[in-house]
Amino acid sequence: MCRRVFIAILFASALIFVAHAQDGPKNSFVLIIRHAEDADSGDGISPLGEKRADAYKDYFLNFTVDSKRLEPKAVFTAKDSKKSHRPRLTLEPFAKAAKLKIDTRFGNSQSAELAANLRANQQGKVILICWRHPYIPALLDALGATPKTFLPNGKWPGAVFNWVILLSFDQEGHLIPSNSRRIDEHLMPGGSQ
């Protein structure tokens, strides 16, 4: 009997901890994009992708939502792989113009580790992340967001390159659904579904 009570108390404590755990970095905004268009071959981006990457420079230097300027102060991209350097190449023009270093320590399957790093080290900032589209749902989930809220069927479509997911976090690091959304950046013709 005593053991059952102990287990019940332990379980209840775990539920309370989970209910109050923070989703993302406190007092922060996280912007998530997919890398620019793929080159026909190799690990880079296409000429259209290069135009998008260059357009992101001014777009994110002047990023405004609801009349509030949200210029990124931290930049993360998925780690380069043998097949793709696209996330890093997509944000290099912006990072150079903003004089920010790109953090490339986290690979595709390290969304939980990236989210933990953001919670621990990036509070009070606007954070820009460029990721590979099949792994964005896991990144959203790791930040306490429901992928189906932002992506059709909870997946980023393969042909879409022009969305920005904006996640807003309060002083406790909890997601603010009313201030979080998907934005169509309208930098290049086409791309949305």
Named regions from a protein language model:
Residues 3-8:
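N-terminal export leaders
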Residues 9, 23-24:
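N-terminal hydrophobic alpha-helix used for membrane targeting or insertion
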Residues 10-11, 59:
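Enrichment for repetitive, rod-forming helical segments
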Residues 11-19:
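Hydrophobic h-region of N-terminal signal peptides that target proteins for export
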Residues 24-124, 135-193:
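Active-site-proximal alpha-helix that buttresses catalytic centers in soluble enzyme cores
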Residues 126-130:
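Periplasmic-binding protein-like
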